[in-house]
Amino acid sequence: MEPACRKDKQKQQTPTRGDRTKQKTAQQELKQRQRAEIYALNKVMTELEQQQFEAFCKQMQSQSE
């Protein structure tokens, strides 16, 4: 009976083709979502940096006058 148990365990550990495809698709979707989040964060940070730079320039300009 032990060899049958071993076969069952091997079957459970080895994902089927459909499972692998689902896993790969899920990983690709996760990667795309993370990439979109990174781009969105980068955009926000760039805008903030630009605002801070403009404020700094105004401050420097008012000090020199």
Swiss-Prot record:
Coiled-coil region(s): 31-51
GO biological process terms on file: axon development; negative regulation of protein ubiquitination; protein secretion; proteolysis; regulation of metallopeptidase activity
Domain of life: Eukaryota
Keyword list, A-Z: Coiled coil, Cytoplasm, Cytoskeleton, Secreted
UniProt-annotated stretches for the region Disordered: 1-30
MF GO annotations: microtubule binding
InterPro entries hit by this protein: SVBP
Basic and acidic residues: compositionally biased ranges: 1-22
Compartment(s): Cytoplasm; Secreted; Cytoplasm, Cytoskeleton
Family according to the record: Belongs to the SVBP family.
Its job: Enhances the tyrosine carboxypeptidase activity of vash1 and vash2, thereby promoting the removal of the C-terminal tyrosine residue of alpha-tubulin. Also required to enhance the solubility and secretion of vash1 and vash2. May play a role in axon and excitatory synapse formation.
Name this protein carries in UniProt: Small vasohibin-binding protein
Organism ancestry: Eukaryota, Metazoa, Chordata, Craniata, Vertebrata
